[in-house]
A protein has these predicted regions:
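N-terminal secretory/targeting leader peptides
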Residues: 1-37, 52-278
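General nucleic-acid-binding
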Residues: 40
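Core domains of carbohydrate- and sulfate-ester-processing enzymes
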Residues: 44-45, 49-50
């Protein structure tokens, strides 16, 4: 409508317009991270599919994708989670396609904006929640309502930000100005990752040392169940939405090719970490 010239958010918030929109930021994991997903967007046909989606929705927008995020934690619980059965029936906060996945696993999902998560858990409206990372979670005060924080999850394991502009406004800019915005987005891609990885690490230390939070790695069995739930959700939506299926197929082609190389080539960095730090 032109009320704003530009905005900044995560693609998951497009979910109400089209489930396919969530595939551009919070979709299933095909062995890739947010870095490779952004590679698909920029070089694997993703941006063309996104523009096709925006056109079909009648949205007058131009978007750039940047800022690869580490996998989001499974989140905050009232006790240590050791298997998926413990989570069944829990009222759990998440958004986008992740809501479908966690529902499939037997949780009762409540979709809340970030600022309402901590009060909702404090009041008992929800039993557990995830938001994004140790820094944001700490800023929201999650350590005051839970002492059990679970890192690693496939519910939102590769997410990025979307910077969007009103298309009429963007098209009115000179070619030079348009390219400045495009390259600024690409520059932010690196700065975001470098800066925030350190922030998240510092705040995770603070959560443990200063606030007495117990930090766990989510069990592989839980993450395996998430992948199975993703399969069900993707198949169900794909059977009803040909464009959703088209995007998933494109992602799989890119991920299979790129990750075949990366997984064969990359050494086990965890092995080197343990060698030096135990």
């Amino acid at each position: 409508r032109g009320v704003l010239d530009g905005a900044h958010y995560v693609p998951a918030y497009w979910y109400s317009k089209s489930p396919a929109a969530s595939l551009f930021g919070t979709g299933p994991c095909f062995g890739w991270s947010a870095q490779e997903m952004l590679g698909w967007i920029h070089y694997g046909g993703g941006i063309e599919l996104f523009n096709e989606l925006m056109g079909s929705l009648g949205l007058n927008l131009v978007s750039f994708f940047n800022s690869p995020m580490p996998a989001q934690p499974l989140g905050w619980f009232k006790s240590h989670i050791t298997d998926s059965a413990q989570m069944k029936g829990m009222k759990y906060r998440t958004v986008g396609l992740a809501a479908d996945v966690m529902n499939e696993m037997g949780l009762s999902v409540v979709q809340l904006p970030g600022g309402e998560i901590q009060p909702a858990m404090k009041s008992g409206l929800i039993d557990a929640a995830e938001f994004n990372n140790p820094t944001s979670d700490k800023d929201f005060g999650m350590q005051d309502v839970s002492k059990h924080y679970h890192l690693a999850s496939f519910h939102q394991s590769q997410e990025c930000f979307e910077v969007t502009f009103n298309k009429k406004k963007f098209d009115s800019l000179s070619s030079e100005q348009q390219h400045i915005l495009r390259y600024a987005s690409e520059a932010e891609n690196s700065n975001f990752y470098w800066n925030n990885t350190l922030r998240y690490a510092d705040d995770l230390i603070s959560l443990k040392k200063d606030h007495g939070v117990n930090v766990y790695r989510t069990p592989d069995s839980v993450m395996a169940d998430q992948l199975k739930a993703w399969d069900i959700v993707v198949d169900r939506i794909s059977s009803k939405d040909p464009f959703f299926a088209k995007v998933v197929a494109s992602q799989k082609v890119y991920a299979k090719k790129v990750m075949d190389y990366l997984l064969l080539n990359q050494p086990d960095y965890g092995l080197a970490y343990k060698h030096h730090f135990g």
